[in-house]
């Protein structure tokens, strides 16, 4: 592989590791000319998969488009780059497991949302607000209420108790 620093055509692999359950191979390389080290990632190239959008148009599957959307939703959130990469890998695995030549954008969006909901709730709401194209604040509120209800159920509380507690805490700070 060509060195990205001096462009010498020969490098040595000094370390190889499997990442994300073998989905990706990370290689540390060293240039034979300048001695600089750099990292490369190897993954299976996705087949010619087409995404069917809501309006019926088709476009080639683009892993990077999913990654950009997730990174945007996670902007300034405590979510690591590795966690984002893992999420994108999981979505891509789900997409490829369908073994279809065409897949709906809804399938991809839903797969991202399911994983984001568990990863970071604020990122989930951010992504949902774009993906679901909320027409008004009421629809956004419904999504937040749904998330709060799910969180309350997971913690063994009703959503009303969670909301009341949050309200009490907010008033006690004033």
Curated annotation (Swiss-Prot):
Region (Disordered): 151-174
unnamed zinc finger span: 3-34
PROSITE patterns per the UniProt record, alphabetical: ATP_CONE
Pfam family, one: ATP-cone
Positions of the ATP-cone domain: 49-139
Textual note on the cofactor: Binds 1 zinc ion.
GO molecular function, one term: zinc ion binding
Highest rank taxon of the organism: Bacteria
Biased composition (Polar residues): 155-174
Transmembrane stretches, start-end: none
Similarity annotation: Belongs to the NrdR family.
Function: Negatively regulates transcription of bacterial ribonucleotide reductase nrd genes and operons by binding to NrdR-boxes.
Protein name according to UniProt: Transcriptional repressor NrdR
Organism taxonomic ancestry: Bacteria, Bacillati, Chloroflexota, Chloroflexia, Chloroflexales
